[in-house]
C-alpha cells in the first residue's frame, strides 16, 4: 500500500511540473516581423510598415517624444529620396526577451549603409532598436543611432556643389 501511495504521489508530482517559460530566443514570429520591417526599409516599401505596427503604436527614434506610424512613413519616403543603395550591411541581428510581466521585446542591431544620390559619398551608421509586441504587432519602438555621419556627408556634398558653382561663376566672368 505504501509503495502504491508513493508511486501515485511521484506520478502526480512529475505530471504537474510545468515546462518553464522560455524567456530568451533568437527565433520567433516577432523576430521575423523585425526582419520584414528592415526589408521594407531596404526595398522602400514604406506603406508596408502599416501592417507591422498597431494603429496607436508609439515610435521613439532618437527622441523622448513619440510619433505615429504615418510620420515614420512620410519621413522615410522623404529622406529616401536623397539616398541610393540603401541596405543593412551584414543583415540584422535580433533577440527576443519575454520579461517577468510577459511582455515580448525584440532587440535588434543593424549596420546601415547608404550612398548619397548624386555623389559617391557613403554613410554607415550603427542602429540599435527595441520593439514591444502585443497581439503580433509592434506597439512601441525605441531606436537610436548617430546622425553625425549623415550630416557630415550632406555638408561635404553641399560644399562640393558650392565650389563647383563658384568655379562656374568665376569662369563666366
Model regions and ranges:
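Low-complexity, intrinsically disordered terminal/linker segments enriched in charged
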Residues: 140-173
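Hydrophobic pocket/interface hotspot
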Residues: 37, 48-50, 57, 72, ...
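Exposed beta-sheet edge and beta->alpha loop/turn motif
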Residues: 109-138, 145-148
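Positively charged n-region of N-terminal signal peptides that target proteins for export
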Residues: 1-4, 19
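Short, low-complexity N-terminal intrinsically disordered segments enriched in polar/charged residues
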Residues: 17-46, 51, 161-173
